[in-house]
Amino acid sequence: MSSKTLLVLLLVGVLVSTFFTADAYPASMDNYDDALEELDNLDLDDYFDLEPADFVLLDMWANMLESSDFDDME
């Protein structure tokens, strides 16, 4: 029971961190073209400002860009 509670709290923490730090990562679909340019322009200082949830989202974003399913959407 406690492991399920811990997992739920971790997931909620990641989601809350994701939505409250939206300016820290360029994953907004509203500015899709700008987001790709900002991803390319991240430097070391930008990585120090990111939180763990942001790294998860950046990894998901990179995997989506590499996947063939994403290519079919264009």
UniProtKB/Swiss-Prot annotation:
Location(s) in or outside the cell: Secreted
A GO term from the CC aspect: extracellular region
Tissue spec. comment: Expressed by the venom gland.
Any one Gene Ontology BP term: defense response to bacterium
Signal peptide stretch: 1-24
Keywords: Antibiotic, Antimicrobial, Secreted, Signal
Record keyword Secreted present: yes
Family stated for the protein in its record: Belongs to the non-disulfide-bridged peptide (NDBP) superfamily. Long chain multifunctional peptide (group 2) family.
UniProt function note: Highly acidic peptide that may have antibacterial activity.
Entry protein name: Peptide BmKa2
Organism: Olivierus martensii
